[in-house]
């Protein structure tokens, strides 16, 4: 870390402290854990390849893992709200049982706040610098997320008012997490 500090100070003297304060954690602190907990599997090869590429790139910045949970089967074509709620509650319990202790939950949901890549970067940096750096991003099933998961969330995040397949949402979110990490590191990828 000392070598990195020297290099940053040499090449970016005026910005070095900002970058170091924003991204780098205390020297003794471990790498930030970022989890992506998803209900359902990636079926399309091209989505899986895209996610795998960003997952590989993220290894330079954080301990990043993806946890896939099974989607509850709903038999009825026009299922009642009670049937959907029961399925969401079961998925919600599985999601919450996979969140690391002390991790901030980021619930991906339509009613969430729309934030920029810079704001996401700042959220991750703030978590890392607070000493409680673990973050768990959560993408629910096609029916959404349980109320319990949404209530537990430190941030409810929306990718906008558009509707997209959850497999695509996973790829976009993984890219945005990578982009946020590059912003925090002062890299040029995000420009």
Model feature map: region roles:
Residues 143, 147-191:
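Structured adenosyl-cofactor binding patch, chiefly the S-adenosyl-L-methionine
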Residues 70-135:
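S-adenosyl-L-methionine/SAH cofactor-binding core of RNA-modifying enzymes
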Residues 31-58:
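N-terminal beta1-alpha1 ligand-phosphate binding loop
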Residues 10-30:
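Short, Lys/Arg-enriched N-terminal segments with co-localized hydrophobic residues
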Residues 60-74:
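A short beta-strand-loop structural module common to alpha/beta enzyme folds
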Residues 35-37, 65-67, 136:
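A structural signal for isolated positions on well-ordered beta-strands in alpha/beta enzyme cores
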Residues 62, 102-103, 153:
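Short, well-ordered alpha-helix to beta-strand connector turns
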Residues 42, 110-113, 141-144:
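Short glycine-rich anion-binding loops that position phosphate/pyrophosphate groups of nucleotides
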């Amino acid at each position: 870390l000392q070598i990195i500090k020297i290099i940053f100070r040499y090449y970016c003297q005026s910005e070095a402290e900002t970058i170091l304060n924003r991204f780098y954690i205390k020297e003794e602190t471990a790498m930030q854990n970022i989890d992506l907990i998803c209900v359902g599997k990636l079926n399309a090869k091209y989505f899986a390849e895209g996610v795998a590429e960003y997952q590989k790139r993220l290894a330079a910045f954080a301990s990043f893992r993806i946890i896939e949970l099974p989607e509850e089967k709903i038999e009825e074509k026009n299922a009642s709200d009670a049937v959907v709620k029961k399925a969401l509650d079961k998925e919600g319990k599985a999601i919450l049982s996979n969140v690391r202790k002390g991790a901030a939950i980021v619930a991906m949901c339509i009613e969430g706040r729309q934030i920029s890549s810079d704001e996401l970067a700042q959220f991750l940096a703030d978590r890392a610098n607070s000493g409680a750096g673990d973050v768990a991003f959560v993408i629910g099933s096609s029916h959404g997320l349980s109320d319990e998961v949404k209530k537990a969330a430190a941030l409810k995040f929306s990718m906008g008012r558009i509707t997209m397949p959850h497999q695509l949402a996973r790829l976009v979110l993984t890219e945005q997490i990578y982009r946020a990490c590059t912003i925090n590191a002062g890299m040029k990828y995000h420009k």
